[in-house]
């Protein structure tokens, strides 16, 4: 009997996530042969859905797997809030190690307890930076009054409001149009999205703020997963481990190639100096401190010191 596995995404072919899904599909079919058939829908937007619809589509079983920003589930799984703390970690490798260790185990348990998913992997959702159409951003004062697109996450909105932005929550599928129309003045995303979504064509000013390391959870419908034969569950885990290693490599590579693309296109790219970055961290500290106080202290320690 062949197990059908449907994997949904919301980005195009060049996306680090879409490319990782292809690695997963090949790895799983190489392991299990005709025992599985993987069907990939790279962009549910082409089916008329918003990106955020993927979460419901997986939870109700229309898809088996998807990737999605952890920030969208933090309201249901409070422990995921540890991944939203800005300026919390400076080392990408250490961040990955924490997610692959005890921190990841805790977060997986939280997701399974509070939702209809299991979190099977933690993908690199990019180091997030600022871009805008108005002016160079060196200080929080430069942010004042700019309409900035955020994810649908109340803490994110509070953080950017503390910097002087006017936050506007917009689905990823609607972001390119919002940028092109001028509905928003600024946004924050990894460089790969800045390029692949065409944002850089309308936002000449890019600030390498590195304010957040994004995490994309690979989520599976829990009931569907638990009903799969053990060999399929084990194969999915093994194939995802291979895909995760590839995905993280893609993310690192895209930072380099996208930065070169911005330089070639003539975008003004500036990197915050250490004092400038400290000024941003100080501006959002009161908001971040409130959020940090809600989290178990040992969870914060697992983020800082991977086990």
Language model segments and positions:
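Hinge/lid segment of periplasmic solute-binding proteins
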Residues: 100-113
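N-terminal secretory/targeting leader peptides
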Residues: 1-94, 112-113, 117-307
């Amino acid at each position: 009997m062949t197990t059908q596995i449907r994997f949904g995404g919301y980005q195009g072919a060049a996306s680090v996530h879409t490319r990782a899904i292809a690695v997963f599909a090949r790895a799983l079919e190489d392991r299990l042969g005709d025992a599985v058939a993987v069907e990939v829908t790279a962009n549910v937007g082409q089916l008329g859905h918003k990106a955020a619809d993927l979460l419901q589509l997986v939870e109700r079983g229309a898809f088996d797997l998807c990737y999605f920003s952890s920030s969208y589930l933090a309201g249901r799984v409070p422990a995921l809030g540890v991944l939203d703390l800005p300026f919390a970690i400076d080392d990408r490798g250490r961040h990955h190690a924490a997610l692959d260790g005890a921190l990841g185990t805790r977060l997986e348990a939280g997701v399974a307890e509070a939702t209809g998913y299991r979190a099977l992997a933690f993908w690199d959702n990019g180091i997030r930076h600022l871009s805008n159409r108005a002016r160079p951003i060196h200080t929080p004062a430069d942010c004042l009054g700019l309409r900035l697109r955020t994810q649908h996450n109340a803490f994110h909105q509070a953080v950017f409001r503390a910097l002087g932005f006017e936050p506007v929550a917009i689905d990823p599928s609607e972001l390119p149009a919002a940028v092109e129309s001028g509905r928003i003045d600024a946004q924050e995303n990894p460089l790969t999205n800045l390029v692949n979504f065409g944002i850089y064509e309308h936002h000449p000013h890019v600030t390498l703020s590195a304010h957040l390391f994004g995490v994309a959870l690979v989520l599976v419908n829990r009931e569907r997963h638990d009903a799969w034969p053990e060999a399929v569950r084990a194969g999915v885990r093994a194939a995802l481990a291979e895909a995760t290693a590839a995905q993280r490599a893609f993310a690192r590579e895209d930072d380099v190639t996208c930065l070169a693309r911005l330089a070639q296109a003539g975008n003004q790219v500036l990197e915050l100096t250490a004092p400038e970055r400290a000024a941003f961290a100080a501006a959002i500290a009161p908001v971040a401190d409130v959020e940090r106080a809600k989290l178990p202290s040992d969870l914060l320690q697992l983020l800082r010191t991977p086990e």
